[in-house]
Regions:
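Conserved acetyl-CoA binding element of GNAT-fold acetyltransferases
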Residues: 92-103
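Conserved GNAT-fold acetyl-CoA-binding loop/helix
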Residues: 36-56
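A short beta-loop-alpha structural element at the N-terminal edge
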Residues: 15-30
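Conserved beta-strand in the GNAT
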Residues: 66-68, 74-83
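Conserved beta-strand-loop-alpha-helix junction that forms the acyl-donor binding cleft
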Residues: 130-141, 158-161
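Conserved GNAT acetyl-CoA-binding A-motif
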Residues: 122-132
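Conserved acetyl-CoA-binding loop-helix of GNAT-fold acetyltransferases
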Residues: 101, 107-120, 142, 146
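A short helix-loop-beta-strand connector motif used in the catalytic cores of GNAT acetyltransferases and
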Residues: 56-68, 95
Length: 161
């Protein structure tokens, strides 16, 4: 599937979502550090992981995508998604790994753009969008519910390697 360069413009180009470009490295790492040092995540991660993530996205594989949000020409946030196939869902599942909007750009409809883009221009076999959200992130939970998300009563377990 061919990836599109620019995804969506709205309101006379006031808000925009587009795929990462090579030149986004510095601003992505800066915003990823903001995100991973915020209450929206359980713990911070080494800065090298942001750089590795960016490299993996720019490499252009079929499993990881990066989206940059802009508002009035300013970097406003980012999204990172991962793609997998799920027998349970019966098709492709997009995991929203990271979704971060800088505080001064929140409640301007930017987060909604990512989900609209995934549904409109994503893989035609897409059956589910999945994400994690901290219980205390009330504004994000409210947005996700308005967009049709529901609580998935699975617990998750991980093993670090």
């Amino acid at each position: 599937m061919k990836k599109k360069g620019v995804c969506a413009y709205t309101q006379a180009d006031v808000k925009m979502i587009r795929r990462f470009k090579d030149t986004d490295r510095e601003i992505f790492i800066e915003m990823a550090e903001e995100f991973y040092n915020s209450p929206a995540v359980l713990h911070s991660i080494p800065i090298s992981r942001h750089s590795d993530t960016f490299d993996e996205i720019i490499k252009g594989g079929c499993y990881l995508d990066g989206y940059m949000f802009e508002y009035e020409g300013q970097p406003a946030g980012f999204g990172v998604t991962a793609k997998t196939y799920s027998p349970e869902a019966g098709g492709i599942v997009i995991w929203v790994e990271d979704l971060y909007i800088r505080p001064q750009f929140r409640s301007k409809g930017l987060g909604r753009l990512l989900f609209e883009e995934l549904e409109r221009n994503g893989d035609p076999r897409l059956k589910r969008i999945r994400l994690e959200v901290e219980e205390g992130n009330i504004k994000a939970i409210s947005l996700y519910k308005r967009l049709g998300f529901r609580h998935l009563p699975y617990g998750q377990m991980v093993k670090e390697l």
